[in-house]
Amino acid sequence: MIFPCLFQSMLNLYAEALSTFSLLFEEAKSSSEIEPDAMMLATASLEGHPSVRTVLLKKFDARGFVFYSHLDSPKGRDLQANPQAALLFLWRSLREAGVQVRIEGRVQQVLAEEADAYFASRPRQSQIGAWASMQSCPLGSPEEFQARLAEVKAMFEGRDVPRPEEWVGFRVVPQVFEFWYGASFRLHERWRYQADAAGYWRKSLLYP
């Protein structure tokens, strides 16, 4: 049977893709997955050099998928120079043989007020760590980091820890969703949702 590409309004298909992700995410949170909110984040420099790492999804809604990091980290520098990214969720325990979700899109920083609110909700020691860590810079010894932690802890003794200016939220605004449902004998099921230049979404079934 041939499945033609389906064209609908941006609102209908985007809402369908987001709802599908939401249902799978809730299923993953109720499963044996250790960190269902862990996602691979792929970025590329302005020169096209790729890199990938695992980050945690902190929020998602109709505006996109949010995570937090330092602007001066490698991913922060990539995203400032080339604000495009891909996300990948892999939940091996779901369905017959696992579920994978890929999301591609442009990236924007969240509003400072939103980042402030999330930072204020974090454990105090995590807030202190955000100030003490020079993320991805060479570290002479574990003792050096412990000394920086103690210094920051003393600096904010008796008062709230504010968000460092360079510690920000990034939102991936989806332009592509792909849902992969694993099956026996590699007869997987793959559905792709993609926005065109005019903002309309297309849904298509892919060969595995």
From Swiss-Prot:
Binds 1 FMN per subunit. Its EC number is 1.4.3.5. PANTHER family: PYRIDOXINE-5'-PHOSPHATE OXIDASE, PYRIDOXINE-5-PHOSPHATE OXIDASE. FMN binds at residues 53-58, 68-69, 75, 100, 135-136, 180, 190. The gene is pdxH. It comes from Xylella fastidiosa (strain Temecula1 / ATCC 700964). Homodimer. The lineage of its organism: Bacteria, Pseudomonadati, Pseudomonadota, Gammaproteobacteria, Lysobacterales. The keyword Flavoprotein applies. Belongs to the pyridoxamine 5'-phosphate oxidase family. The keyword Oxidoreductase applies. This is Pyridoxine/pyridoxamine 5'-phosphate oxidase. Catalyzes the oxidation of either pyridoxine 5'-phosphate (PNP) or pyridoxamine 5'-phosphate (PMP) into pyridoxal 5'-phosphate (PLP). Pfam families: PNP_phzG_C, PNPOx_N. Substrate binds at residues 58, 118, 122, 126, 186-188.
